[in-house]
Curated annotation (Swiss-Prot):
Active-site residues (renumbered): 210, 343
Originating gene: eno1
Protein name: Alpha-enolase
Cofactor annotation comment: Binds two Mg(2+) per subunit. Required for catalysis and for stabilizing the dimer.
CDD domains (UniProt xref): enolase
Species: Xenopus laevis (African clawed frog)
Amino acid sequence: MSIKNIRAREIFDSRGNPTVEVDLYTCKGLFRAAVPSGASTGIYEALELRDNDKTRYLGKGVGRAVKYVNEFLGPALCTQNLNVVEQEKIDKLMIEMDGTENKSKFGANALLGVSLAVCKAGAAEKGVPLYRHIADLAGNPEVILPVPAFNVINGGSHAGNKLAMQEFMILPVGADSFKEAMRIGAEVYHNLKNVIKEKYGKDATNVGDEGGFAPNILENKEALELLKTAINKAGYPDKIVIGMDVAASEFYRDGKYDLDFKSPDDPSRYISPDKLAELYMSFVKNYPVVSIEDPFDQDHWEAWTKFTAASGIQVVGDDLTVTNPKRIAKAVEEKACNCLLLKVNQIGTVTESLEACKLAQSNGWGVMVSHRSGETEDTFIADLVVGLCTGQIKTGAPCRSERLAKYNQLLRIEEELGSKARFAGKNFRKPVFN
């Protein structure tokens, strides 16, 4: 089934910034995809093309990316008579047309919008759910429901508080199903709201970009204490573990780290990577912290390797690896981390995302599928995580519709699978099939 027409437009993401949406038409109908964008972006990510016209959307318009889809990528794909099930062929053609290392000609946001829409159309052409089509593309005979990592306390670049570390997450690994994991997560979230309100007042329960609370606390340990209290109040101390996304590149300063980076600069308070690693180890010792993402700067390889060897927990590469096979290969060689954060817009096509996932998994790593802080109502990543069998997803708190859109889609998938549904649970790092 060939492509009849492709049209792109500017729409808005959850932060009110323009982003790219693509409509792809085949004789089976219309297939629509929207592209997310991040706030704390790694310097090695594929280029998200913005207009940089300060008179329009403060320079954040995506008119050029839309134009490239409508005038170049779309017409080229329509005239090639390609079948939408040929995901790799279509993605490789777009990559060749762009011709740059980081997709800077057309923009990763232009390519990704088309790539996602093609994938949705491919599933319809085969008459299968999107997650099954993705599983086929990845060579997975089985599918698995992930453990959700709910980002319930926000700091860093995602919130206006003093907290340096960006995300404090709860993972209901003790649940028996995705549906139960959602219930546990929602109950802890509401308990946390009450705990924060009692301690810091009602305005402390305002939410950040990803639906988590952003109380004005400075000590990262205090965020963990709040989580511990809420988990106990909800009655789930044996069913929940904690994950963190430190996003340390955001407060990296000349080989050291500034845990009060939102205050006026003061080099005397910077701490060494060893001191920061000690702080992480104290978290692991005193709280059920089992996963830490981006504990150090994206180029601080030595600190990563040392910490991964010593910590014994899941160490997730995001800014370090940027879903890029070259960066992943280097991280494997350096033993810098043991889990990949998979963000489709960091690399720009479905095919390359699948390649990155397979590379990580073949080297014994875990993989966590992720949203971005600037999201849309698109639910592609819910099907992606099921099809790729990664066992873990982070797509915000159980709050804000652009976050719940993904979680609700996972509930539907679990229901559709019925007795065949398998939930990763405690095996979230390396899901197993019985």
